[in-house]
Design a protein with these regions (language model features):
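Extended, well-folded catalytic/binding cores that form a central cleft or groove in large enzyme
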Residues: 1-249, 253-256
Length: 256
């Protein structure tokens, strides 16, 4: 290990789970809302959150939990603001997580500012109860794994995704074609798009990634998939990627 230089003494505090459990339950007895604020507050990206949460807990012991009703309270306000930010990120990630098929296992990556995987865990485990999947948090090096009604959160330094199969690449192209053609050109509004789909989420979204981005990360060249071939099992009404859609009959009563 490299030697670290500091003007201050460094003190390592070993976690005492029994002691921590007693403190948490004492907070819970005073205010269930405060216990939830503390638990979720540790998952936020609030700078110096430990110090701010300590001040909040101290005020809870000294004055009770009534101050939590006032979001303008100088002790509670920064924590409440961080919790709102995390809630907004959670709401977006419930819709922005993009899974790919890796040999029968669904996999996705995210880059959140807050440590959201513990809070997303139940949502995705319920939603994909019959699947096996994983979600990797690049920011916090955390991996959520689910299979056969069991889920685990693991600490993983890095994750190298397997190369996608031809069918997966074709489905990605279909999804991109849908994304590109569903928009109304005359109503294109990048400012509105950036509001509802912020750019920082797009680095892990299929719509904005090359089909073979895993291979590019590993320096592997994949053979080009045939753009004219349809995806196995895809509805006949969906054109193959890069194939212009054919004209169809007009709506009943139309002269077009």
């Amino acid at each position: 290990d490299e030697e670290c230089w500091s003007l201050y003494d460094v003190r390592y505090v070993v976690t005492q789970r029994e002691h921590a459990s007693r403190v948490y339950h004492s907070i819970l007895r005073r205010s269930k809302a405060a216990a939830d604020v503390v638990r979720r507050g540790f998952l936020t990206c609030l700078p110096e959150k430990e110090t701010r949460l300590y001040a909040l807990i101290k005020k809870l012991y000294d004055e009770g939990g009534d101050f939590l009703r006032n979001t303008a309270d100088p002790v509670y306000y920064p924590v409440a603001k961080a919790l709102r930010h995390m809630s907004g990120e959670l709401e977006k990630l419930r819709g922005f997580v993009r899974f790919s098929d890796y040999s029968g296992v669904l996999g996705a990556e995210i880059e959140p500012k807050n440590r959201v995987l513990p809070l997303l865990r139940r949502h995705f485990c319920d939603r994909y109860a019959n699947e096996s999947f994983f979600i990797y948090d690049r920011t916090h090096k955390e991996l959520l794994v689910y299979t056969k009604n069991h889920s685990r959160l693991l600490t993983v330094d890095s994750l190298h995704l397997a190369l996608p199969g031809e069918e997966e690449v074709q489905f990605r192209r279909l999804w991109k074609r849908f994304y590109e053609t569903i928009a109304i050109k005359e109503r294109y509004n990048p400012r509105c798009q950036n509001t509802f789909m912020p750019k920082r989420y797009r680095c892990t979204m299929t719509e904005f990634l090359p089909d073979d981005y895993e291979a590019r990360q590993q320096g592997v060249n994949l053979p080009a998939a045939s753009e004219a071939s349809p995806v196995p099992g895809a509805p006949a009404g969906i054109s193959a990627p890069a194939t212009p859609p054919r004209s169809g009959p007009s709506a009943p009563g139309s002269d077009l």
